């Protein structure tokens, strides 16, 4: 009989009952499929009392004669050691088959879970990188976790009365703009300090450092403001000290950019990001290899990939309960890049509409091409 033959059988091993080619270990004996089926049916249907030998129980059983005498064939099954207690009735056989199928399905699910569900956490090397980035952020993040206690609300009358009409419907309140410029220099300085605390950034050529900082500065400042969105007062806290409304930020010079930052803040409030996640977002923004004019593009790209991998593994470690947390968080990088691009365009309008003496030198140095 052809078909699957278990590996534990020797080549051409024979059935101990009839001498036909064996197919496996059945009911404690190595037998062919025919004798296995005969033995099972006999026990399940209790047929052996009905068997009768015409030749006084002395028949020789082989693969030719096995179907001629059921009594002698059954006796030989018992003689060679086939176990009647291993034969299951229909209900037990169905239960066993169901159990086998359930176990098989369980193993399939477990293997699938291992394949697609395994979420690696940071390696020792990645933990060291995460530690460096987090410490850099904490050391340069104004007011730290005490920002709510330290913040001061911009007076309501500031930023509500636009006196200069900017192009494209934007409005600039010069008093609000003046207030914002007072905190912009320390805010920019903190972004620079953050970058300079990262060894991989400091190892880059000075020209690349400048390009990266000019490219990411608004993005990182926007992120730091967005994670300090307060839904109760509907304000963002700038540089850890000045709480402003959407209208004040808009009329103070940012125009539609303020809407994007506020919307980002509202969205991020459900993410419950910790300092490490904010720090890694900043590192990813900093090491953007697509900034025009860079020399060490591949080196910067490799560095960003290292941050992204450590970041993803840290997200796995944190076990957020938001569905698709990691891809959703990565989309915020795109949002921040868009904010940076919109601000670059908005900056040109501000330069036209606001007196030059109101712009701090560092502000001009970072945002002018």
Swiss-Prot record:
Annotated localization: Nucleus
Chain ranges of the NR LBD domain: 125-369
Example GO molecular function: sequence-specific double-stranded DNA binding
Position of the signal peptide: none
UniProt KW keywords: DNA-binding, Metal-binding, Nucleus, Receptor, Transcription, Transcription regulation, Zinc, Zinc-finger
Zinc finger boundaries on the chain: NR C4-type: 15-35, 53-77
UniProt superkingdom: Eukaryota
Annotation: DNA-binding region: 15-89
Gene Ontology BP term (one): thyroid hormone receptor signaling pathway
Chain residue ranges for the region called Modulating: 1-14
Main location group: nucleus
Sites where the protein binds L-thyroxine: 190, 239, 343
PROSITE patterns: NR_LBD, NUCLEAR_REC_DBD_1, NUCLEAR_REC_DBD_2
Residues engaged in binding Zn(2+) 2: 53, 59, 69, 72
InterPro entries, per database record: NHR-like_dom_sf (IPR035500), Nucl_hrmn_rcpt_lig-bd (IPR000536), Nuclear_hormone_rcpt_NR1 (IPR050234), Nuclear_hrmn_rcpt (IPR001723), ThyrH_rcpt (IPR001728), Znf_hrmn_rcpt (IPR001628), Znf_NHR/GATA (IPR013088)
Binding-site positions, 3,3',5-triiodo-L-thyronine: 190, 239
UniProt-annotated binding residues for Zn(2+) 1: 15, 18, 32, 35
GO cellular component, one term: nucleus
Binding locations of 3,3',5-triiodo-L-thyronine 1: 343
Family: Belongs to the nuclear hormone receptor family. NR1 subfamily.
Domain notes: Composed of three domains: a modulating N-terminal domain, a DNA-binding domain and a C-terminal ligand-binding domain.
Role noted for this protein: Nuclear hormone receptor that can act as a repressor or activator of transcription. High affinity receptor for thyroid hormones, including triiodothyronine and thyroxine.
Name of the molecule in the record: Thyroid hormone receptor beta
Species of origin: Gallus gallus (Chicken)
Higher taxonomy: Eukaryota, Metazoa, Chordata, Craniata, Vertebrata
Gene: THRB
